[in-house]
Amino acid sequence: MGTFKIYPGKLKGEVKTPPSKSMAHRGVICAALGDGISKIRNINYSDDIIATINAMRSLGAIITKEDEYLHVIGIKSEKCKKNIELNRTIDCNESGSTLRFLVPISCIFEGSSRFIGRGNLGKRPLDTYYEIFDNQGIKHSYKKGKLDLRIEGILKCGEFKLRGDISSQFISGMLFTLPLLEGDSKVIITTDLESKGYIDLTLSAMSDFGIEIINNNYREFIIKGNQTYKSRNYRIEGDYSQAAFFLVADALKSEVFINDLNLESLQGDKEVIEILERMNMKIKNIDNGLLGIQRENLGSTIIDGSQCPDIIPVISLAASLCNGRTEIINVGRLRIKECDRLSAVASELNKLGAHIIEKEDSLIIDGVKTLKGGVKVWSHKDHRIAMMLAIASTVCMEPIILEDYECISKSYPAFFDDFKALGGNFHEWNLGE
């Protein structure tokens, strides 16, 4: 367990946004399903992305890390056709995206697949897939509360009805898989679709690799079978969910300029810009992708987090220092992330002096003038909680003690390097200091 003592003080300087984790998952999968050689540039080797790389290796892709790119030989190439093992183990580590994307993909191959993982991953629901397996006679067994899932059987084309309000990862997993089946398929969304931005990223990546899918207003997706992922060179754009930490730092009087962001991005977490503007920030777009921030007193608002769940922890920090009451609604899904994020946000920010009321599907946040600090806080072993608390420390009256900071490696391994380069002041802390 690593512990940092982090001191107050504003951040100042320029930071390069780390590559998008969401796009990297999708780029690696599409390239690995391809028919030749792809080169993926600007990729961040976080724990989650390494899990997806290793998972696609387990399915037969040949993937090597070069100096400036990831070299991927797709499973449909002649070199890889006999590379897959009949009985394979796919280690997802703690990556929910890896698990939910790869479960249906694994069902296009003969033999059996065993999925294992760590942390909270065994608590992530997979009932959507179990229903499909039961309907198609695909054998599966699992241990409740622990990720040890075994699957044997071939997925067949057809019509699939999926809820849109559980996780878009199930929909993406099926969309990746169905074009490779022999016949045509249809995916019907039976409820309002949350996290549309993630579906847009999936469809965009698949289109970039030559796959065609008809999207009928996010209510149904028509997928032709017997398609081929066409290998290509691919660059991962900057990650808005990570840029959000420094945008909020700017809202709290830091002076950080964030570059390498695609201002036309399809990322759902780009909504951080619109949310902060509603909270009375002025955000300036610079030609090279920088976002310059001019700060004003923050105002309260109502935030629907259904389309951008990953930025809710750090947005909650900004709301804690707004004038008035902010309501963050439709965020019940955050309870089944790396931790119960609603509970973690409320408990840890309240320790610092915030005033947050946690409800089943929402957070009610009454703004305060200052955060006191001077206490020990815990990341809950969740990367987004750890980074949010680090940003919170910059405006506290006293230093904070942050426990379990290493979890940042899940998505942004260089976060504290960037934090330090911007003037962040912290050091390892030992009990009794």
Swiss-Prot record:
Enzyme active site: D310 (proton acceptor)
Pathway: Metabolic intermediate biosynthesis; chorismate biosynthesis; chorismate from D-erythrose 4-phosphate and phosphoenolpyruvate: step 6/7
A GO cellular component entry from the record: cytoplasm
Recorded GO MF terms: 3-phosphoshikimate 1-carboxyvinyltransferase activity
Pfam families: EPSP_synthase (PF00275)
EC category: transferase
Extent of the signal sequence: none
Keywords: Amino-acid biosynthesis, Aromatic amino acid biosynthesis, Cytoplasm, Transferase
Domain of life: Bacteria
GO terms under biological process: amino acid biosynthetic process; aromatic amino acid family biosynthetic process; chorismate biosynthetic process
Binding site for phosphoenolpyruvate: K21, G96, R124, Q169, R341, R384, K410
InterPro entries: Enolpyruvate_Tfrase_dom (IPR001986), Enolpyruvate_Tfrase_sf (IPR036968), EPSP_synthase (IPR006264), EPSP_synthase_CS (IPR023193), RNA3'P_cycl/enolpyr_Trfase_a/b (IPR013792)
The enzyme's E.C. designation: 2.5.1.19
Binding residues annotated for 3-phosphoshikimate, in chain numbering: K21, S22, R26, S167, S168, Q169, S195, D310, K337
Subcellular location: Cytoplasm
Reactions catalysed: 3-phosphoshikimate + phosphoenolpyruvate = 5-O-(1-carboxyvinyl)-3-phosphoshikimate + phosphate
Family recorded in the similarity comment: Belongs to the EPSP synthase family.
Subunit structure: Monomer.
Biological role: Catalyzes the transfer of the enolpyruvyl moiety of phosphoenolpyruvate (PEP) to the 5-hydroxyl of shikimate-3-phosphate (S3P) to produce enolpyruvyl shikimate-3-phosphate and inorganic phosphate.
Name this polypeptide is given: 3-phosphoshikimate 1-carboxyvinyltransferase
Gene name linked to the record: aroA
